[in-house]
Amino acid sequence: MNTIFHLASIGALALIPTVAGETTTTTKLCVELEVPVPVRATNQLFDQPRVDSTIDAIDWTVWVSTRTTPPVTERLLGNKTIDDKFLINAQLCVPSDKGPKADILQIATPGLGFDKRYFDAEIQPDEYSYVNAALKKGYSILTYDRLGTGKSQKPNAYDIVQIPTEIEILASLTKIARSGKLISSSKVLSKSSRTISDFVPSKVVQIGYSFGSFLIQNVVARYPELSDGAILTALYPNTIPYSQMIDVLHYDHEFPKENDPARFSEYGSGYFVLSNEADLQKLFFQKKSLDPALLTYTEKIKQPETVGEYASEGLSSYLVADNFKGPVHFFIGEFDNFVCRGDCRDIYNQTEAERIFPHSNPTYYLQPETGHAPALSKNASAGFEVMLGYLDSHNL
């Protein structure tokens, strides 16, 4: 895997309060939507093996990490222009009592291996649901399944589900939300007993997890006018040399239809999924903050990834957000195995953080005893307080 998933950690955290503003009691009012999202992007065609079985999936991980495999820049076959609409499954939740933060919309983007349920766990939601935590502080929040995951559309895994497409999906979804036409332009799939109406948010804050955080970094750099702030979790600019970073060979993958034929029946060639709970523990968790029930839940909600995402990673990087002036906060597990080779202490790269966010005064926070999935670890609710406290301290 490339540096985009390992870079992280911007400036020491400046006096974030332990309690984020005033907590309110609120009923969860949500509407599930199928959003047609227009996308124009330039993807790449790559020379690479096909993945049509678990044998292929394992062989692909070996091939892509073999020292003599040509770099991605030498495997380019040309451009592929994407000009289409994709059906994205999303959930908009608003507080039942309209307070001063109700018109601040958070948009949460999950990472590889997850859909929007990463932010809205069904197990002990008061502890593990970031959606619930945000609503209790009076925010509105939009979560969505990235392309190729959950209930969203599952197109070609080689040529369409790539990083450029996913960046533009987030940008377009943000534009639709800011226009006040999110609900009216979508198909309503289910809703709470009380009707939720379209509204024009006064501010938009991007909340990312891992790969989702990287997408957000690119979106705020390309489209600075769309967002007013960002919290990037499980992403951390650091000083680990590229040669020491963990690559995809550390984790076993299977062809989705062979891993779970019923659950993954829609997934075709080019998709693969993490094999089992052991792989999920290695990637996402640390023993001290691991609740076995959450590990089982993670296995239940895990999502496939695509060959195209990994291939396009080799052509992707952080962009300098010259025109973005909103606050940025990096939030990382103290012992994130994936980003920091198991220990994120004392490796924060402030120079890199300030290079990519020169006008955002970026800060960082290490969530104690936590791995790569802080929202699904035992101390999740304490971490949510830190994140929401950061927003409150910046008038968001």
PLM features per residue range, with description:
Residues 1-22:
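Fungal secretory targeting signals
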Residues 22-101:
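N-terminal cap/lid segment of alpha/beta-hydrolase-fold proteins
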Residues 57, 65-73, 245-344:
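Alpha/beta-hydrolase
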Residues 96-142:
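Short, surface-exposed "cap/lid" segments of acyl-processing enzymes
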Residues 159-198:
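Alpha/beta-hydrolase active-site loop
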Residues 199-240:
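Conserved hydrolase catalytic core segment
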Residues 334-370:
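Conserved loop-alpha-helix segment in the C-terminal half of the alpha/beta-hydrolase fold
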Residues 367-380:
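Catalytic histidine-centered segment of alpha/beta-hydrolase-like enzymes
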